[in-house]
Amino acid sequence: MVKFKLKEVKPSVFAVIVKNKYDRAMLFCRAQEYYESPNPNFKNKFFSIWDYIKWYSLKNNGFSYPFDWSGFNFPYEVAQRCYSVSKVENKYDELFKNILMFIKNKLKNNKGYIIGVESLKDDTYRHEMCHALYYTNSLYRGS
């Protein structure tokens, strides 16, 4: 069982707080790599998480993803697209689909942002919030 908290930290910005580094990385891996993977076989494509793990492992001499990344961020709409074409392959997919349903019921216009962090009190949180505010707040963007 993955222990997490879900909190709307700013209007339309949702933080998924997962203390366990491995669980956090695995929960966010599929949508994050769908959003901005450097490998065109995964970015904006349906992919098996097992194919991604194999590719990442070969590229990095082992599957170090949970140790390489501590924070995650992407637009809600991207995660929705990702999970609309991806089949559930593990408990993390199942949980993330449930998180998306919860967020969908909270959004007014289907536009939002999701961040994945260990806590709401560290540099990673502040960094991920910069991405979220840039996306959701025109005053923050300066436009």
Question: Which residues are covered by each model-predicted region?
Answer:
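Short, solvent-exposed loop/turn segments at secondary-structure junctions
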Residues: 22-23, 120-121, 139-140
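A metal-dependent hydrolase signature that marks the N-terminal structural subdomain at the beginning
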Residues: 1-112
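Short pre-active-site segment immediately N-terminal to the catalytic Zn-binding motif
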Residues: 111-126
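Post-HExxH zinc-binding segment in Zn-dependent metallohydrolases
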Residues: 135-143
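Active-site recognition of the HExxH zinc-binding catalytic motif
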Residues: 123-136
